[in-house]
């Protein structure tokens, strides 16, 4: 975007933009012993979904409504192939934002749910903490690191333990 365009454009700041985490987020970051129970995308007769600790969690069309007309919104499960690339790829998201006149976006999780509930409800607390940290590292370094200032991270916390939550705030704050 040119400086002239930026100065003359009327811009919005979105404070509630959900990101659809790409399939590699946890598989690239979790220790090997957790790969089989950590979040990963599976495809079976029922379609494509996240699998975490043996629980199958589909992504609905409502979570991937970006770029669609209201009448196309659907609560039915969707695949990554059905989604607009800007739902899960940061450079494409920034291009979509620029086209829509959005200067900055506060980025919220989707699969981890509100405040990282998916990991708060994990059977294995160690795995839950590692998933929280993996998500935050990805969100800060990879997603928001693509375009600092335009993509703003909303971290998640291990809400089951106040000391772990404080430590995660300090750890992520140190990342910038």
Protein language model regions, located:
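Helix-coil boundary/capping segments in enzymes
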Residues: 1-176
């Amino acid at each position: 975007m040119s400086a002239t365009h930026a100065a003359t454009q009327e811009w919005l700041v979105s404070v509630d933009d959900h990101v659809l985490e790409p399939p590699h987020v946890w598989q690239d970051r979790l220790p090997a012993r957790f790969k089989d129970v950590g979040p990963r995308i599976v495809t079976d007769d029922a379609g494509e979904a996240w699998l975490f600790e043996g629980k199958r969690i589909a992504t609905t069309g409502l979570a991937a409504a970006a770029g669609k007309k209201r009448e196309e919104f659907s609560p039915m499960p969707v695949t990554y192939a059905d989604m607009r690339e800007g739902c899960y790829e940061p450079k494409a998201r920034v291009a979509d934002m620029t086209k829509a006149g959005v200067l900055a976006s506060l980025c919220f999780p989707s699969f981890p749910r509100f405040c990282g509930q998916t990991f708060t409800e994990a059977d294995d607390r160690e795995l839950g903490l590692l998933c929280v940290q993996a998500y935050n590292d990805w969100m800060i370094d990879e997603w928001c690191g693509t375009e600092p200032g335009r993509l703003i991270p909303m971290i998640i916390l291990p809400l089951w333990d106040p000391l772990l939550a404080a430590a995660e705030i300090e750890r992520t704050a140190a990342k910038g």
